[in-house]
Amino acid sequence: MNPQANDRKEFQGDCSATGDLTAKHDSAGGNGGGGARYKLMSPAKLPISRSTDITIPPGLSPTSFLESPVFISNIKPEPSPTTGSLFKPRPVHISASSSSYTGRGFHQNTFTEQKSSEFEFRPPASNMVYAELGKIRSEPPVHFQGQGHGSSHSPSSISDAAGSSSELSRPTPPCQMTPTSSDIPAGSDQEESIQTSQNDSRGSTPSILADDGYNWRKYGQKHVKGSEFPRSYYKCTHPNCEVKKLFERSHDGQITDIIYKGTHDHPKPQPGRRNSGGMAAQEERLDKYPSSTGRDEKGSGVYNLSNPNEQTGNPEVPPISASDDGGEAAASNRNKDEPDDDDPFSKRRRMEGAMEITPLVKPIREPRVVVQTLSEVDILDDGYRWRKYGQKVVRGNPNPRSYYKCTAHGCPVRKHVERASHDPKAVITTYEGKHDHDVPTSKSSSNHEIQPRFRPDETDTISLNLGVGISSDGPNHASNEHQHQNQQLVNQTHPNGVNFRFVHASPMSSYYASLNSGMNQYGQRETKNETQNGDISSLNNSSYPYPPNMGRVQSGP
């Protein structure tokens, strides 16, 4: 029997009952070597017919092309997308004698019949669908060439025939979709997509690995000598915590080095009260390292597995309370501290990705006491000693405000003094705190009131000596001497025998003395009396408190 006629007869029958077409061809070959010749031929050297018509013999259904073993694709399974690699299916070109056939298809038992020692991602065969079957229309037509005539059929016929099959119309969840060779770029594009997918899988891990449970605030970033990547500096946001963290991040998002300085003296914050850094970190990572598989509008199985939130159309947005380690969080956030007008301790942190306002813990304040007085000087004497440590102009008052601190050791009292904006003569003094010590006994350096050193009392004894002498005896002796001196002045006559009235021709120095608690204090005062009549009552009563007893002194015969 002619081998070529035998091949045509076998192909016209049921292809599913004939077994392996390759084995039949080897058993029917003329010289026994034709069956192995196609294995040595390059796919580019296979003859391809350019015929545009197709002839299907009677008794052959178009759906049998999909079920025939001829359409088995030599898919070499490789590690699944979970390990960072993709499938690389390669179609097998089979030629029989003078005929050649190039096709692509899937069988239900394709993956179950494959034997591999590597890890494979195999979805259930019953739920597997022929992905992207509609793309066959855009591919070159599949040709079949016989002995005496050539016949070809376009992919549209197979697609239309496959559309009537109930097996192909079965809905399948997207997560079980298997990528085909048309979904994966060829050549360098395929390698690029594999490498980018691996970067995406690694890019999502740094924020998780660097999460230590604390809240961090970024305060700087710079390039350090000897480091390949920039170094970011973070500080713990807990009040009075001095722990700092610095780490270096590579260009692909990998955290290469993390250094902690100090030890936390507080427990980790609750998850509900942590800063929202995870969302900012994810947004920054997506902006800096976009996934190349995201450019495929139709999507593939690998993209759906690595990015499940993009497949469903509902982007996964972390809650506001969710947090990252703060290192990744603060890379795109800039915390802005806004001090209050009169409250230097209260600060608000405004996050770009969240509207959470976290007030810092304020120290306990002492009560304030405000005193307003009218004075020409700014500082009033309150008995305490103060040291000035600052001055500034506050908003709403053009007059400067001076800040003082009590000089006593350990005293927390402070005050600030300023003149009122509505009244320049009014001095406003604000005290903060309470003194924990007594008022100093010595005179304050800020005392501007001049007190008299000596205040004579009306009951004190005063001796008017009139320049003759100073008495240090008791009050009786001083009084007797005073009367004696007055008597001498009255009886005094002029050398020429002319009587005179009690007149002081020249200023005289008078001394006064007072006996106070056994101590004699002396003073000197210059007095002038140029009147003709000597009136003793004109003397200063403060230095001579006794009432005059001689009246007007006159001299005469």
From Swiss-Prot:
**Which sites bind Zn(2+)?**
236, 241, 264, 266, 406, 411, 435, 437
Subcellular localization is given as: Nucleus
What SMART domains would the database entry show? WRKY
Please give the superkingdom of this protein's source. Eukaryota
- State where composition is biased (Basic and acidic residues): 1-12, 282-299
**Comp. bias (Low complexity):** 151-169, 321-332
Q: Which GO terms describe its cellular component?
A: nucleus
Q: Name one GO molecular function term.
A: DNA-binding transcription factor activity
Identify the keywords attached in UniProt to this record, alphabetized: DNA-binding, Metal-binding, Nucleus, Repeat, Transcription, Transcription regulation, Zinc
The annotated regions of Polar residues compositional bias extend over 95-114, 193-207, 303-314, 520-536
Ranges for region Disordered: 1-36, 76-215, 257-348, 433-486, 520-557
Record-annotated DNA-binding residue ranges: 205-269, 375-440
Family matches, as InterPro entries = WRKY_dom (IPR003657), WRKY_dom_sf (IPR036576), WRKY_plant (IPR044810)
Which Gene Ontology terms describe the biological processes this protein takes part in?
positive regulation of DNA-templated transcription; response to 1-aminocyclopropane-1-carboxylic acid; response to wounding
Q: Which Pfam families match?
A: WRKY
The UniProt family comment states:
Belongs to the WRKY group I family.
User: What is the annotated role of this protein in its UniProt record?
Assistant: Transcription factor. Interacts specifically with the W box (5'-(T)TGAC[CT]-3'), a frequently occurring elicitor-responsive cis-acting element.
This chain belongs to which protein, by name? Probable WRKY transcription factor 20
Q: Which gene encodes it?
A: WRKY20
